[in-house]
Amino acid sequence: MKKELLESCAAMYRTPAYIFDTDCFRQTIRNLRDSFGKDVGLCYAMKANPFLADRAENEADRIEICSMGEFQICREKRIEPKKMLISGVMKSPEDLAEILGYCGEDSLYTVESMRQADYLESWSRQREKKIRILLRLSSGNQFGMDEDTLIHLLQKIQNHPYLKIQGIHYFSGTQKQIAKTVGELRKLDDLLKRLEKEYGIQLEELEFGPGLAVAYFDRQKDCIREEIRELSRAIGELRWKGKVTLEMGRAMAASCGTYLTTVKDTKQNGGRNYCIVDGGIHQIHYDGQIRGMYP
């Protein structure tokens, strides 16, 4: 954004303030679509910046909603349920009942555990409504299910009349090195091919969070363009031929925001220069968790 515009915003809204260039946000998503091609889906992980969820609705194929606060934001913004991917993380039966009551068959849901699968199975059977689900594969932490549990669940419900398994969801973290991302993608390719060969299970979609690293500071090397090319090449080399949807937050949102703060005082202590500003460190930390829990 131009300096004159930022100065005008600072005068109008006062500081500290976040200023978001929504045209830049939209263009970033369009650039990503051009880079990966029309066959690769794009999902906006709104935890990166919940303020941009409604802007993402018309550009991304879907919006990943993690917390109940994020769901409430989308509901208030009247974002269509068909654009929502509902994460199973930290969802109680009461939470799921509220979400299902609003979204029903229109949304896509990720399943984090056998317990969640049982709840969705019961809900869909009682109402005779079909629900599309993604089974989340754990990366070795507390999220998702390990491979044995996931395969067991696939076998258990692959022919269920109301639960349709659309594919697998995988996300292991953010700000990763591209070598790790490509390695994870190849392991997922091996698993998807093994499911076809050994179990006769053909899945339609892989929802994959690449966790591309974003340069936030002036001295950081910005490698995202090279990493996008490498990731696109790796997707093209997959032996499994289903649809890949890339779930991204920072890679879409980081470049469109500017944080404004005003220097209120300057001084020198012990030979070191200091600026006292009206902003706080809490305002440049990861905002998604706070905004998502308390909309």
Per-region residue spans from a language model:
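Active-site-proximal beta-alpha core segment in soluble small-molecule metabolic enzymes
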Residues: 39-205, 230, 234, 267
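Generic N-terminal amphipathic, Lys/Arg-enriched alpha-helix
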Residues: 4-16
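Charged (often Lys/Glu-rich) extended helix/loop segments that serve as interaction or gating elements
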Residues: 5, 230, 243-295
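Acidic, glycine-rich loop-and-beta core segments that form the ion-binding/anion-interacting portion
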Residues: 187-248
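Glycine-rich beta-alpha junction loops
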Residues: 137-139, 172-176, 210-214, 250-252, ...
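A glycine-/small-polar-enriched, mobile loop at the entrance of the PLP active site in fold-type I
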Residues: 13-22, 42-43
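Short glycine/threonine-rich loop-to-helix capping motif typified by GTGT followed
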Residues: 178-184, 215-227, 254-265
